[in-house]
């Protein structure tokens, strides 16, 4: 079963980047071409599984990195080659600060579930991550809600006039939210 997360949108971009750069069509060690930032390890696993299913015949290497596991095992996976890196903010900063990952080839950054990242207190790490990727890159920001805080985040990290795509009614609460009225 494929759970199509926003990472699915960049599969084609990764394929384009692979073939344009210096004629190489395979993952180049610890230099990912795309980065997906998600709030939880469960989402890292989910996104990687979906990408692997969708790119089964494309030779695109997706590596998931998250805390709570052996960093050496994850380091070995990165050094085998990575096109698409899916990670939680804290673990990305760990592997970046330890020189395990290099960012100059990153062309696309996906910030998935931005509202949850903010709720979980990951804004400092998110800012740090966006400071270490190349200035010239595309950022895709996904959020279930579009609060004032998310609008400020978009203004801070996205192009001056980003394309905004909405699905559903923005005033309709998510089904998981229970609204009560007390009199």
Labelled PLM ranges:
Residues 1-183:
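SF2 DExD/H RNA helicase N-terminal ATP-binding lobe
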